[in-house]
């Protein structure tokens, strides 16, 4: 057990018996009241966001974690099969662990899997940006290229991304895996 003041963003704690990752932690001292920490956390088992107010003197149980790089191989039902880059061991990761960023998983991409002290998978950290090929989008006309705005495009992983009008089928684009937004066109 450690004081809440020693915990920071990204720490994984055991809260009400389940693992939660701290997404933001703000120290507040309102007027003549006692200081507290306002925490926004994500339940790693259910994926739900939780907001809680800890008193400044409160202690929390920090989970000791290990982070290891794994390579994505393929999807097997509702699980994703990943391979340890060093030992070539394969593990199955449930789809709920990845959340919405799983729609940008493509063969060979490297992710970081966070394991708890008991060996269970707590979280999967995707790369912030991923480069994908546009496989389907509406054709552009000369007039479309002159205007700003977006159009829907299907990328190689099957996800739909809003892209600028000048993007065509076969273009390589960079996408933010956290939000699913188009970042830029990649020139190769």
From Swiss-Prot:
This is Elongation factor P. Involved in peptide bond synthesis. Stimulates efficient translation and peptide-bond synthesis on native or reconstituted 70S ribosomes in vitro. Probably functions indirectly by altering the affinity of the ribosome for aminoacyl-tRNA, thus increasing their reactivity as acceptors for peptidyl transferase. Pathway: Protein biosynthesis; polypeptide chain elongation. Gene3D superfamilies: 2.30.30.30, Nucleic acid-binding proteins. Belongs to the elongation factor P family. GO terms for molecular function: translation elongation factor activity. Keywords: Cytoplasm, Elongation factor, Protein biosynthesis. One of its GO terms (cellular component) is cytoplasm. GO terms for biological process: peptide biosynthetic process. CDD domains: S1_EF-P_repeat_1, S1_EF-P_repeat_2. NCBIfam families: efp (TIGR00038), PRK00529.1 (NF001810). It comes from Chlorobium phaeobacteroides (strain DSM 266 / SMG 266 / 2430). It is found in: Cytoplasm.
């Amino acid at each position: 057990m450690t004081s809440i003041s020693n915990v920071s963003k990204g720490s994984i704690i055991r809260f009400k018996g389940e693992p939660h990752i701290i997404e933001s932690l703000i120290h507040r001292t309102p007027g003549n009241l006692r200081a507290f920490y306002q925490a926004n956390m994500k339940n790693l088992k259910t994926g739900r966001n939780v907001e809680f107010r800890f008193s400044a003197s409160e202690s929390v149980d920090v989970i000791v974690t290990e982070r290891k790089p794994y390579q994505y191989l393929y999807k097997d039902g509702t699980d994703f099969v990943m391979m340890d880059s060093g030992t070539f061991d394969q593990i199955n990761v449930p789809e709920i662990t990845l959340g919405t960023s799983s729609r940008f998983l493509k063969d060979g991409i490297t992710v970081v899997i966070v394991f708890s002290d008991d060996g269970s998978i707590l979280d999967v950290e995707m790369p912030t940006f991923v480069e994908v090929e546009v496989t389907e989008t509406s054709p552009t006309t000369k007039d479309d290229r002159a205007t700003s705005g977006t159009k829907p495009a299907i990328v190689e992983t099957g996800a739909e991304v809003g892209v600028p009008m000048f993007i065509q089928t076969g273009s390589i684009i960079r996408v933010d895996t956290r939000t699913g937004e188009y970042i830029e066109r990649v020139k190769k």
